[in-house]
Structures are given as structure tokens and as C-alpha cells.
Amino acid sequence: MSGTTGERPFSDIITSVRYWVIHSITIPALFIAGWLFVSTGLAYDAFGTPRPNEYFTPARQEVPIVKNRFEAKKQVEQFIGK
């Protein structure tokens, strides 16, 4: 026995003016917020990743690859200079 869930059909939602008024503002706002998050460098600070100019320092020009998983902590500390 099938019934109805009481929800509006999707076709009614996407053809309503209210849907497009709300989404014509929120979708571009999300893109702009994401662009600002990355372009200001806040994404690097929030996630702790190095900025593009910090991958290779003047003292270390090789790629920092961990070669022994059992001594990974020591190797990472050598890479960052601790």
C-alpha cells in the first residue's frame, strides 16, 4: 500500500519564484565566500597547509618525502627544522 509523504513535488519547488529568489542570492554568495576563503590565504591557515611559496625553503630544496614509516615523526621534525 503506497501513500504520500506529504512533501512538495520537486517540480513545484524548482518552478516557484521563491526558490529562485533565495537561490539566486545564496549560490553566488557561496562561490564568492569560497573564493575569498582561498584567495586571502585563510584556507592555508585553517587547514595548516603550507602556502605555495613555503614548500621549498632556501635551506631545503628537495622534496620532503617520508621514507621510513616507523621513524616518520623524526623525519617530519627534520623537515620542519625542529
Curated annotation (Swiss-Prot):
It is found in: Cellular thylakoid membrane. One of its GO terms (biological process) is photosynthetic electron transport chain. Its main location: membrane. Gene3D superfamilies: Photosystem II cytochrome b559, alpha subunit. Its cofactor is heme b. The keyword Plastid does not apply. Belongs to the PsbE/PsbF family. This b-type cytochrome is tightly associated with the reaction center of photosystem II (PSII). PSII is a light-driven water:plastoquinone oxidoreductase that uses light energy to abstract electrons from H(2)O, generating O(2) and a proton gradient subsequently used for ATP formation. It consists of a core antenna complex that captures photons, and an electron transfer chain that converts photonic excitation into a charge separation. This is Cytochrome b559 subunit alpha. It comes from Nostoc punctiforme (strain ATCC 29133 / PCC 73102). The lineage of its organism: Bacteria, Bacillati, Cyanobacteriota, Cyanophyceae, Nostocales. The gene is psbE.
